[in-house]
Amino acid sequence: MSELVDRNVTTPEASLPGGPADLRPGLVPETPADRDPRRSTEPLWRSLTHGRGLAGAVLVGIVVLLGALAPVLAPFAPDEQLDAAFLLGPNSTHWLGTDDVNRDVLSRVLLGIRADLVIVFFAVPVGAILGSLIGLVAGIRGYTDVVAQRVFDVILAFPALVLAIALTAVLGPGVRAIVLVIVLAEIPVFGRLIRTSVLRVRELPYVEAAVVSGASTGWVLRKHVLPNSIEPLGVQLALSMSVAVFIEGAMSFLGIGVVPPTPSLGSILSDGNRYLETNPLFAVGPLVVVSLLTLGFLLISQAFAHARRL
């Protein structure tokens, strides 16, 4: 456990009753996080019940609900070619009209929401978990910190879209490339966040006392580092969701994302961009959904950040 402290504590108080020499993992002075780790998350979840947090939760909730119920709500199969006219405007049968190959735009948007959410809700947590694990190891310092920092620097040197184009050239377009781009983009973000938390918490007096008393690295990480990292993780997770929505939409818009005929919001927006004058809702529909989803996650992130400052 010597890695967690850079100096030995040899103060006279160490020999006094109640001093660091008497401390054991079960006797370390309690902190708010020690008394109830859930307290770290309560302000965050309460922020979703009012103001910006509530507005963001409602927006994200509506889009998620539409995506979850897409197979039920979609009036037609997403790739079904209909008997109606090409690029038909909105009407009672086709609320958002039809596209350039005579498919119902509303059905494709609903199924596109579902595809996008599956990608985002899978890729971001995977990137967060991998980045957090690397950040925990790096925060203990040693050669692992240097290696992790250099890896983070290399990844961050490439803008997300440049990284997407490079990976697509190797792997080909598709869901696998999108997921990998999002995961790689999030690893250094969460890695540096957790590393900073570890470096900050390890210098606190009660953590140093626990280390001197013989507490293991795992115990210190579990009791002190992780509870104190929940709030910044929540803020970054919400923000990363909005970034991931943009990355997926941009990749599909450029034709290097979800492969047709599978619908995605970015690919529908790309197709509709060519027919703005004929059927503007062809492009406006997916654009509104992407905007609402991104705005919702941003509002949640801002609400979480405000709750941390209270």
Predicted regions and their residues:
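Transmembrane alpha-helix signature in integral membrane proteins
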Residues: 105-137
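Short helix-to-coil transition segments within interhelical loops
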Residues: 98-103, 141, 155, 209-228, ...
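Glycine-rich helix-loop "coupling/hinge" segments at transmembrane-helix boundaries
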Residues: 156, 167-170, 197-198, 247-290, ...
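Transmembrane alpha-helical segments of polytopic membrane transport and secretion proteins
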Residues: 1-61, 298-310
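Non-cytoplasmic
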Residues: 162-166, 174-186, 233-268
